[in-house]
Design a protein with these regions (language model features):
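Conserved NAD(P)H cofactor-binding loop of Rossmann-fold oxidoreductase domains
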Residues: 82-90, 241
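Conserved glycine-rich Rossmann-like NAD(P)H-binding loop of the short-chain dehydrogenase/reductase
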Residues: 25-40
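Short C-terminal tail/terminal secondary-structure segment
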Residues: 141, 221, 232-245
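Catalytic loop of short-chain dehydrogenase/reductase
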Residues: 85, 130-162, 167-175
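Short, small/polar-rich loop/turn modules that mediate ligand/substrate recognition or access, typified
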Residues: 175, 180, 231-233
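Catalytic Tyr-X3-Lys loop
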Residues: 95-115, 130, 156-158, 163
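Conserved glycine-rich cofactor-binding loop
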Residues: 11-12
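Substrate-binding pocket helix/loop in short-chain dehydrogenase/reductase
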Residues: 90-106, 143-144, 152, 201
Length: 245
């Protein structure tokens, strides 16, 4: 198969939505997870859906993914760099980010997308790359959104900002190979927060609400389609207007 879509972090909140969307659209989808159980649960015996187990905290993670694709006999036409490591978000009680968490966040948000994109580009079938960033890669944390001591995970924001710039650099580097590289920057998605947080978020967002799970799909679908054939190096912001005021 030469038209598979690879979605890293395919069993998380956004990744699982993307996996289900593209599989329902008839695409061959391969996703990554650290858990065999999550892979089996997601596939659930369905054809055209494949999982590769990998721990992206490993220095050889990109090679592990490529080896997994080779075992499955799949060639990737589109890559969505979506993997996350929630453990890297930790901040000390005094608000200081430990060095280990700076490095872990940059590894999964910058180094991994870079290495995996280049590894797949060498295969010759890759045509589309979408990196997944965050509104905090473009905007500083707003202390009015949070209760209690304000200890923002700056490592996350800085790494996501770097990913946006990496998108532009790779778009230039890979253009001669006819590979388009773009980014989607999301605002806050419902599901991991309580009602009080949602109210505070709504008061700070022009559209007065958080994103729904289903709204995470549209921009990625566009960028991986023929409608975006002449689009590269761009960052599509899907944040309900969070960053415009």
């Amino acid at each position: 198969m030469k038209d598979a879509i690879l979605i890293t972090g395919g069993t998380g909140k956004i990744g699982s939505r993307l996996v289900e969307h593209f599989h329902a659209a008839g695409r061959t989808v391969v996703f990554t997870s650290r858990s065999d159980a999550n892979i089996e649960k997601t596939i659930a015996g369905r054809e055209g859906l494949h999982g590769v187990k990998v721990d992206f905290r490993s220095g050889s993670a990109a090679e592990t993914v490529v080896a997994g694709l080779d075992r499955l006999g799949l060639e990737v036409a589109a890559l969505v760099n979506n993997a996350r490591d929630l453990a890297a978000l930790g901040v000390d009680e005094d608000g200081t980010v430990p060095d280990a968490n700076w490095l872990a966040e940059y590894r999964i948000d910058v180094v991994l997308p870079y290495r995996l994109t280049l590894a797949l580009a060498k295969k010759g079938t890759l045509r589309k790359v979408v990196n997944v960033s965050s509104m905090y890669g473009m905007n500083a944390f707003n202390p009015h959104l949070y209760e209690g001591p304000f200890r923002p995970p700056l490592q996350y924001a800085c790494a996501k900002a770097a990913l946006i710039h990496l998108t532009k650099c790779l778009a230039v580097q890979l253009a001669p190979q006819k590979i388009a590289v773009n980014c989607v920057t999301y605002g806050g998605v419902e599901g991991r927060v309580d009602e009080e947080f949602k109210k505070r978020y709504a008061a700070l967002c022009p559209m007065e609400r958080m994103m729904t799970d289903g709204e995470t799909v549209g921009a990625v679908d566009f960028l991986l389609s023929d409608r975006a054939a002449y689009v590269t190096g761009q960052n599509i912001v899907v944040d309900g207007g969070w960053g415009i005021w």
